[in-house]
């Protein structure tokens, strides 16, 4: 009898349907930097204008980045007050940390408030919080700070994820899926908040991979509400999370890594990161979509982490994608740069909005099935299979 009762309890705890994205919100710092003029600004503010050859290399990197603009918390005024941040490897961790501890939760708050407003439900319905960032390790962490900033219940179940890097946005969705589907009625607030203050530093001839990061990375935060079995009257589904997996790519150790030092976060990139990802992308697709009998990669919508133009180009070429398949990822790269873990949630937001604007039938550019990829340190690849929903028909109240 006890075994039967335990089974009944277990079944009562589980949701009936798939985890679903119910709302998305994004936020960026007010300070905007344009890629066309960034090399001049960067070498001037770091007092490195004497490195003319290096500046020319950086200019070429920026020109090839396919980025139009980025947003950054670090303004020239802040950098003038913190000159050690502008040096290449000066002891500056305390100054960087002081900035991140305040700004990471604050930026996350901006994104979370937008997601909560779109969701339209009371804060008391949020049961879980998952917070992801590469900056500002502290106890209690950014999850605690955000709970206070938003006025969430003190009983919200929190999970703090530090130092995941660029695959972290997919990771939080995978974890939220597991939470929502195994806790009936759960509503999970996921937040990814990233700022470049921990990794900003002056240029150095012997560390060109650091310059690559300075040409690509920007600040941004994204949030989403995840839950299973949406209330048909009060909640509007955006995407369903069908399956999720994570893998470490073979022979990829050291391709992307980051180390927290007294000089801040140092990031190292091998040149062949795009090649390593593209060589393994088909296997990830086959493993994810074999149960669905899908093998035409142009028949699905794509949410790929916009790590840089070379990654998107190589993946497109490898699987024979139409150029328009990566449109949402390229738009986020162009307008915001690589925002690490927050990026894929920005891409989700762009896709569902552009699908509605273009009059398409579903939130996934008119397609039913889609894939979300996160790429990051390890090399680690996160793969999520998504299912779109019909684009909502505007009502008189929302028009």
Curated annotation (Swiss-Prot):
Family: Belongs to the thiolase-like superfamily. Chalcone/stilbene synthases family.
Name of the coding gene: CHS2
Pfam families the UniProt entry points to: Chal_sti_synt_C, Chal_sti_synt_N
Reaction it catalyzes: (E)-4-coumaroyl-CoA + 3 malonyl-CoA + 3 H(+) = 2',4,4',6'-tetrahydroxychalcone + 3 CO2 + 4 CoA
Key words, A-Z: Acyltransferase, Flavonoid biosynthesis, Transferase
A GO molecular-function annotation: naringenin-chalcone synthase activity
One example of a Gene Ontology biological process annotation: flavonoid biosynthetic process
Active site (catalytic residues): 166
Major enzyme class: transferase
Biological role: The primary product of this enzyme is 4,2',4',6'-tetrahydroxychalcone (also termed naringenin-chalcone or chalcone) which can under specific conditions spontaneously isomerize into naringenin. Substrate preference is feruloyl-CoA = caffeoyl-CoA >> cinnamoyl-CoA.
Organism superkingdom: Eukaryota
Protein name: Chalcone synthase 2
Pathway: Secondary metabolite biosynthesis; flavonoid biosynthesis
Gene3D superfamilies referenced in this protein's UniProt entry, alphabetically: 3.40.47.10
Induction section of the entry: Strong in response to inoculation with fungi.
InterPro entries: Chalcone/stilbene_synt_C, Chalcone/stilbene_synt_N, Chalcone/stilbene_synthase_AS, Polyketide_synthase_type-III, Thiolase-like
EC numbers on record: 2.3.1.74
Disulfide linkage: none
């Amino acid at each position: 009898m006890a075994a039967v009762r335990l089974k009944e309890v277990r079944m009562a705890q589980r949701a009936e349907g798939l985890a679903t994205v119910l709302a998305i919100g994004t936020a960026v710092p007010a300070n905007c930097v344009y890629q066309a003029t960034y090399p001049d600004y960067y070498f001037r503010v770091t007092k490195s204008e004497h490195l003319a050859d290096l500046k020319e290399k950086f200019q070429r990197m920026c020109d090839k980045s396919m980025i139009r603009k980025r947003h950054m918390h670090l303004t020239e005024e802040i950098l003038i007050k913190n000159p050690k941040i502008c040096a290449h490897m000066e002891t500056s961790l305390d100054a960087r940390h002081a900035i991140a501890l305040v700004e990471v939760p604050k930026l996350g708050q901006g994104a979370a408030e937008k997601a909560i407003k779109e969701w339209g439900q009371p804060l008391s319905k949020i049961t879980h919080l998952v917070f992801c960032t590469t900056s500002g390790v502290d106890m209690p962490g950014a999850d605690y700070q955000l709970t206070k900033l938003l006025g969430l219940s003190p009983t919200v179940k929190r999970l703090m994820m530090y130092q995941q890097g660029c695959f972290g946005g997919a990771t939080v969705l995978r974890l939220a899926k597991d939470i929502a589907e195994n806790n009936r009625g759960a509503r999970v607030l996921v937040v990814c908040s990233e700022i470049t203050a921990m990794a900003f530093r002056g240029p150095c001839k012997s560390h060109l991979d650091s310059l690559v990061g300075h040409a690509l990375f920007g600040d941004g935060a994204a949030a989403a509400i995840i839950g299973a079995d949406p209330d048909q009257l009060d909640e509007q589904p955006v995407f369903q999370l069908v399956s999720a997996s994570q893998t470490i790519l073979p022979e990829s150790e050291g391709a992307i890594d980051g180390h927290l030092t007294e000089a801040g976060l140092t990031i190292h990139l091998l040149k062949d990161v795009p090649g390593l990802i593209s060589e393994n992308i088909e296997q990830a697709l086959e493993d994810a979509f074999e149960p669905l009998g899908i093998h035409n990669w142009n028949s699905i919508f794509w949410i790929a982490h916009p790590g840089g133009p070379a990654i998107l180009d190589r993946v497109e070429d490898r699987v024979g994608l139409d150029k328009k398949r990566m449109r949402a990822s390229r738009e986020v790269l162009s307008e915001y740069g690589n925002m690490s873990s927050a990026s894929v949630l920005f891409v989700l937001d762009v896709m569902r909005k552009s699908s509605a604007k273009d009059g398409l039938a579903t939130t996934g550019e008119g397609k039913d099935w889609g894939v979300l990829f996160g790429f990051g340190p390890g090399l680690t690849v996160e793969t999520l299979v998504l299912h779109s929903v019909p684009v909502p028909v505007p009502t008189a109240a929302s028009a």
